Amino acid sequence: MFFIVKGRGTLRYGAETRTIRAGDFICCPTGGPETAHQIINDSDAELAYISVSTMMPAEVCEYPDSGKVGAFGGSGASRLRHMTPADAKVDYWKDEA
């Protein structure tokens, strides 16, 4: 969820775009490429927003424009941050005993 504090810009949500401005609350439910979202400052002024998250221990994101998948989670020494091409294929049992 995002709260637009000041400025204006564009929200890209799937294939749609919408103008956003100060005072707007935005909710972007999870899903596939059809729910990918991006906030774009296409104005000449500063765009400021607050992002609110569930802070779940792990997050998987699809990047449809670049064909990647990212997996993120944890903190400190156990932190996970992994990006890979979406079409990379690895068998579940590869290198497993």
Where do the protein language model's features map onto the residues?
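Hydrophobic alpha-helical bundle architecture
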Residues: C28, Q38-I40
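Short acidic-glycine-tyrosine-enriched beta hairpin
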Residues: R8, G14-G31
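Surface-exposed, flexible loop/turn segments at secondary-structure boundaries
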Residues: G9, E34, P57
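Short, conserved beta-strand element in jelly-roll/cupin
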Residues: M1-R12, V52-T54
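Double-stranded beta-helix
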Residues: I40-A97
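Extracellular structured ligand-interaction cores
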Residues: R8, A36, Y49
